[in-house]
A protein has these predicted regions:
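Sec-dependent signal peptide recognition
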Residues: 1-7
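N-terminal signal peptide c-region/cleavage motif recognized by signal peptidases
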Residues: 11-12
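OB-fold and OB-like single-stranded nucleic-acid-recognition modules
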Residues: 15-140
Length: 140
């Protein structure tokens, strides 16, 4: 475990509320583990989802302990990163969540190295770990 991860783990308080919950549809499907977690890695895949979010598979530089078995088997050993309301919403139950919201997070490309901050959550619907929503992203 890297010293940076240990510092982040113990300096961040765990809170029971997600960032921007009004712009996340069905928030009950996400279990907050840690707020404001900063990680880095290389973009393995970028997917525009029907709910308006952009899903990014991030191959982590370190902190592989942030992954669970579902990340290994279903996400090719990557952490899922979600930039909310960043593309066209076609999923009916997600339209309201993105209404009057303008994404300001930059969208990385395949192969980009990024530093990303967001809420580290368990997606109970899919079973894998994510950063959702991303609150800050730097493309290096």
């Amino acid at each position: 475990m890297s010293p940076l991860f240990i510092l982040l783990l113990f300096s961040s308080s765990i809170i029971a509320q997600l960032h921007s919950p009004s712009h996340i549809y069905h928030t009950e499907r996400l279990l907050l583990i840690q707020s404001n977690l900063t990680i880095s890695g290389t973009v393995d895949k970028v997917i525009n989802e029907k709910d308006g979010d952009i899903h990014i598979r991030l191959k982590l530089d370190s902190c592989s302990n942030l992954l669970n078995e579902k990340n290994i088997t279903s996400q090719h050993g990557c952490l899922v990163i979600e930039i909310i309301c960043a593309c066209k919403v076609t999923q009916p139950d997600a339209i309201t969540a993105c209404k009057n919201y303008s994404n300001t997070i930059p969208i990385p490309k395949l192969g980009d190295h990024i530093i990303v901050t967001g809420d580290y959550v368990l997606d109970k619907q899919h079973g894998w770990m994510e950063e959702h929503p991303v609150t800050k992203l730097i493309i290096q």
